[in-house]
Curated annotation (Swiss-Prot):
<keyword id="KW-0689">Ribosomal protein</keyword>
<keyword id="KW-0687">Ribonucleoprotein</keyword>
<feature type="domain" description="S4 RNA-binding">
    <location>
        <begin position="106"/>
        <end position="130"/>
    </location>
</feature>
<keyword id="KW-0694">RNA-binding</keyword>
<dbReference type="GO" id="GO:1990904">
    <property type="term" value="C:ribonucleoprotein complex"/>
</dbReference>
<keyword id="KW-0699">rRNA-binding</keyword>
<dbReference type="GO" id="GO:0019843">
    <property type="term" value="F:rRNA binding"/>
</dbReference>
<dbReference type="InterPro" id="IPR005710">
    <property type="entry name" value="Ribosomal_uS4_euk/arc"/>
</dbReference>
<comment type="similarity">
    <text>Belongs to the universal ribosomal protein uS4 family.</text>
</comment>
<comment type="function">
    <text>Component of the small ribosomal subunit. The ribosome is a large ribonucleoprotein complex responsible for the synthesis of proteins in the cell. Part of the small subunit (SSU) processome, first precursor of the small eukaryotic ribosomal subunit. During the assembly of the SSU processome in the nucleolus, many ribosome biogenesis factors, an RNA chaperone and ribosomal proteins associate with the nascent pre-rRNA and work in concert to generate RNA folding, modifications, rearrangements and cleavage as well as targeted degradation of pre-ribosomal RNA by the RNA exosome.</text>
</comment>
<dbReference type="InterPro" id="IPR022801">
    <property type="entry name" value="Ribosomal_uS4"/>
</dbReference>
<feature type="cross-link" description="Glycyl lysine isopeptide (Lys-Gly) (interchain with G-Cter in SUMO2)">
    <location>
        <position position="91"/>
    </location>
</feature>
<dbReference type="GO" id="GO:0006412">
    <property type="term" value="P:translation"/>
</dbReference>
<dbReference type="InterPro" id="IPR001912">
    <property type="entry name" value="Ribosomal_uS4_N"/>
</dbReference>
<feature type="modified residue" description="N6-acetyllysine">
    <location>
        <position position="114"/>
    </location>
</feature>
<feature type="modified residue" description="N6-acetyllysine">
    <location>
        <position position="64"/>
    </location>
</feature>
<keyword id="KW-0832">Ubl conjugation</keyword>
Amino acid sequence: VARSWVCRKTYVTPRRPFEKSRLDQELKLIGEYGLRNKREVWRVKFTLAKIRKAARELLTLDEKDPRRLFEGNALLRRLVRIGVLDEGKMKLDYILGLKIEDFLERRLQTQVFKLGLAXSIHHXRVLIRQ
């Protein structure tokens, strides 16, 4: 029986597997946000890369281009809705300034810990699983 799986890759592995500066940075993120593995870091990094790529492409278009106006507003509204971008910063230029930490701050695990409902960032993950 032939099955076709409709799925796409949600992360991209690093080009250089043993780059010390990157490994240290990822380990710091994992510790700070209580992530389970490197794949969770790569997933957020990939999402950010896709959003920034779309913003860069839209910025190359003319200011009055209908595609830039329509898709740009949609992208900005989406980022404001998920809480990554402030409503005062609704410009494509601000999307390029986003960091991986902006996305990791919006995770439920981080929010539970920041609100003081959990004793540690790892405890927050346990509470969510219950």
